[in-house]
From Swiss-Prot:
The lineage of its organism: Bacteria, Pseudomonadati, Pseudomonadota, Gammaproteobacteria, Enterobacterales. It catalyses: uracil + FMNH2 + NADH + O2 = (Z)-3-ureidoacrylate + FMN + NAD(+) + H2O + H(+); thymine + FMNH2 + NADH + O2 = (Z)-2-methylureidoacrylate + FMN + NAD(+) + H2O + H(+). Keywords: Flavoprotein, FMN, Monooxygenase, NADP, Oxidoreductase. The keyword NADP applies. Pfam families: Bac_luciferase. One of its GO terms (molecular function) is alkanesulfonate monooxygenase activity. Its EC number is 1.14.99.46. Induction: Up-regulated by the nitrogen regulatory protein C (NtrC also called GlnG) and repressed by RutR. This is Pyrimidine monooxygenase RutA. The keyword Repeat does not apply. InterPro entries: Luciferase-like_dom (IPR011251), Luciferase-like_sf (IPR036661), Pyrimidine_monooxygenase_RutA (IPR019914), SsuD_RutA_monooxygenase (IPR050172). The FMN-N(5)-oxide reacts spontaneously with NADH to produce FMN. Requires the flavin reductase RutF to regenerate FMN in vivo. It comes from the Bacteria.
Length: 364
């Protein structure tokens, strides 16, 4: 079975950088409605990112953002089955604090919580607070994250850490209570360094889908992750990010997609390109360089599935056929209606979710 998750819109306007796309602010009530609807349709998990400074432009893209841990704590309290993941911007939060917050949300959720660790690539997010460690950090960020996760594992596993490293020094550091079950750690490494980290420490790794209606184009990325995991003797699957834009017919959906592209906020796209060029130390295979690619920058170049309900179902089944692909993380042009049509019209047609069809119909 392929896992299905929703990438909740913690920032304004979700993931479409377009004046023609729905314009909305992030609120707890909106995200509660989205995640409860996702749970109703048997989505497996919900994840929120963290963004500390937006991209500006006419659409004020991501200038308005909630905070990930507090949002997901609230969502954990109003759900009962769906897995909940928050994102830690590790430059802003000491690992001992993240360990304690995660243990708290584990208690709120009844063991349904996990943590997504990010190193931070957007320099202005951290410069505005005076905590950017300098541009050498670009080349050492996974060294930093390795120490960070070792402290987390100590505290979650034993309740105590005396870790000593280049970045962190723990002196009989304590966290109790500990999580009720082993805490899941996820990452989104796409560079060689990121995948090596995920292979060693993550439970699964997110990657970008690629292109428009090319559902298996990410296969080389999944293969790289699989190969990296084989080096560590661990099973670390890939979860792939896609935007779903669906309607009754392929033509109607294609027209909607072209309309969104025609309204692209060029000021935001230029700024994103500029930011992607700031990191000259991490190589050419990072997530941010894919985000800024002009091919489909209107939705940050995540894989895009545009078509009728049947076409999208077929393409998601193709995703499931890729070796190493264990799940997808979905965004929608309109989240509330998108999740409903996914649950009612797309998921029942998916072979990789066929076992849920009868169950979904019972609760619909």
């Amino acid at each position: 079975m392929m896992k299905i998750g929703v990438f909740v819109p913690i920032g304004n306007n979700g993931w479409l950088i377009s004046t023609h796309a729905p314009q909305y602010m992030p609120t707890f009530e909106l995200n509660k409605a989205i995640v409860q609807k996702a749970e109703h349709y048997h989505f497996d998990f919900a994840l929120s990112m963290i963004k500390l400074r937006g991209f500006g432009g006419k659409t004020e893209f991501w200038d308005h953002n909630l905070e990930s841990f507090t949002l997901m704590a609230g969502l954990a309290a109003v759900t009962s089955r769906i897995q909940i993941y928050a994102t830690a911007a590790t430059l802003t939060l000491p690992p001992a604090i993240v360990a304690r917050m995660a243990a708290t949300i584990d208690s709120i959720s009844g063991g349904r919580f996990g943590v997504n660790l990010v190193t931070g690539w957007q320099k202005p997010e951290y410069e505005q607070m005076g905590i950017w460690p300098g541009d050498d950090y670009f080349s050492r960020r996974y060294d930093y994250l390795t120490e960070y996760v070792q402290v987390l594992r100590d505290l979650w596993g034993t309740g105590k850490s005396d870790f000593k490293g280049d970045f962190f020094t723990m002196n009989d550091c304590r966290v109790s209570p500990q999580p009720s079950i082993p805490m899941k750690v996820i990452c989104a490494g796409q560079s060689d360094a990121g995948m090596a980290f995920s292979a060693q420490y993550a439970d699964f790794n997110f990657c970008f889908g690629k292109g428009v209606n090319t559902p298996t184009a990410f296969a080389p990325t999944a293969a790289r992750m699989k190969q990296a995991a084989e080096q560590t003797g661990r099973d670390v699957g890939s979860y792939v990010l896609f935007m779903v834009i669906a309607d009754e017919t392929d033509d109607a959906t294609r027209a909607k997609w072209e309309h969104y592209k025609a309204g692209a906020d060029e000021e935001v796209l230029s700024w994103l390109t500029e930011q992607s060029q700031k990191d000259t130390r991490s190589g050419t295979d990072t997530n941010v360089r894919q985000m800024a690619d002009p091919t489909s920058a209107v939705n940050i170049n995540m894989g895009t599935l545009v078509g009728s309900y049947a076409s999208v179902a077929r393409m998601l089944d193709e995703v499931a056929s890729v070796p190493g692909a264990e799940g997808v993380l979905l965004t929608f042009d309109d989240f509330l209606s998108g999740i409903e049509t996914f649950g009612e019209r797309i998921q029942p047609l998916m072979q990789c979710r066929a076992h849920l069809s009868a169950l979904t119909q019972e609760v619909a």
